[in-house]
Design a protein with these regions (language model features):
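Glycine-rich phosphate-binding active-site loops on the catalytic face of alpha/beta enzymes
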Residues: 148-168, 206-213
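Solvent-exposed, charged amphipathic helical/linker segments at domain boundaries
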Residues: 164-180
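Low-complexity, intrinsically disordered or signal/transmembrane-proximal segments
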Residues: 1-3, 9
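Conserved N-terminal beta1-alpha1 strand-loop-helix module at the mouth
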Residues: 19-134, 141-144, 175-203, 212-221
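Short, intrinsically disordered, charge-balanced linker/junction segments flanking boundaries
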Residues: 20, 228-231
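C-terminal helical cap(s) of enzyme catalytic domains, especially alpha/beta-barrels
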Residues: 223-227
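Short hydrophobic alpha-helical segments of the AMP-binding
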Residues: 149, 176, 228
């Protein structure tokens, strides 16, 4: 019994050490995969597909961006790992209506709860308040999350190149298109761009924040701007 406890203690220490050496992005993805599996066990796909919004029409963010003077995608974010609470005591409706009245092309809604304080309810409230494209900003690792996005009123999903393989990006983006959703791919460097670019993507965005360290530099956008194709 003493040997068993010692072995269990050693394994626990190894797990703790591994967690301590992980960057924030790796921790988020581990938590996200667990979260998705839990949700799958609680809410079946059939329930998502039965949503009133599941078969509703979607708005094209890519078309609006091409014909816009501002080219702005605004964001609804409650907090983040780098800045803690940003604005936690506001009305989702007021924020998104303000964005729409300001002439933005679309709104990105954070739905991650643990690290960003968001929820799918925020997306639902936004959908009920505006008639411009909504992007579900989430760490998507599974088709189930794309079904959720459709059921809660998203028009666009975000795929993050840093956490997905090329095969996964292709699979997830094609699945999103099958549901009538557009796809915005987020890249951070040239390697991610060259690896992930493919016909099933509608838009590509450059994140100036390194998701592994959360450091920010505008040099990333400057470097990649000329390398992203127009079509």
């Amino acid at each position: 019994q003493a040997q068993t406890r010692t072995k269990e203690h050693s394994e626990s220490e190894r797990c703790d050490t591994k967690l301590k050496t992980m960057n924030i992005l790796e921790k988020i993805i581990i938590d996200k995969k667990r979260e998705v599996e839990l949700k799958k066990s609680i809410i079946p796909v059939s329930q998502l597909e039965a949503s009133v919004l599941f078969n509703s029409r979607t708005y094209s963010m890519s078309k609006l961006l091409k014909n816009s003077f501002s080219g702005i995608i605004a964001e609804h974010k409650r907090r983040s790992p780098s800045k803690a609470i940003i604005n936690n005591n506001h009305s989702v409706e007021d924020v998104v209506l303000g964005y729409q009245n300001a002439g933005v092309c679309g709104i990105s809604v954070l739905t991650d709860a643990k690290y960003f304080g968001g929820s799918l309810d925020d997306l639902l409230l936004a959908k009920a308040s505006v008639n411009i494209p909504l992007l579900r900003k989430e760490f998507i690792v599974d088709e189930y999350q794309i079904l959720e996005a459709k059921a809660y009123g998203a028009d666009v999903i975000l795929l993050i190149a840093a956490v997905l393989t090329r095969k996964e990006i292709k699979q997830l983006s094609e699945f999103a298109h099958s549901l009538g959703l557009e796809v915005l791919l987020e890249v951070h460097n040239l390697e991610e761009l060259e690896t992930a670019i493919m016909p099933s993507l509608d838009m590509i965005g450059v994140n100036n924040r390194n998701l592994k360290s959360f450091e920010v530099s505008l040099d990333y956008s400057k470097e990649l701007a000329s390398k992203i194709p127009d079509e």
